[in-house]
Swiss-Prot record:
Belongs to the OCC1 family. It comes from Rattus norvegicus. Residues 1-10 have a biased composition (Polar residues). The lineage of its organism: Eukaryota, Metazoa, Chordata, Craniata, Vertebrata. This is Overexpressed in colon carcinoma 1 protein homolog. It comes from the Eukaryota. PANTHER family: OVEREXPRESSED IN COLON CARCINOMA 1 PROTEIN (PTHR38502:SF1).
Length: 63
């Protein structure tokens, strides 16, 4: 409710085999959530940020 996913899930569930559609929908939502932009606020980490964080963590561990 109040989520962008609720509309897509409701529309997909109304067609074909509910079990098969549900599995495919859950997988795609999971992937979308990793890259979703909620009202101008980016949710998730871009690959550059992940690389920076991992390099900083290595530096902290060495010192």
């Amino acid at each position: 409710m109040g989520c962008g996913n609720s509309t897509a899930t409701s529309a997909a569930a109304g067609r074909g085999k509910p079990g098969a559609v549900k599995d495919a929908t859950e997988d795609s939502i999971t992937e979308d959530d990793k890259r979703r932009n909620y009202g101008g606020v980016y949710v998730g980490l871009p690959s550059e940020a992940v690389n920076i964080a991992s390099s900083q963590a290595k530096t902290v561990q060495k010192s």
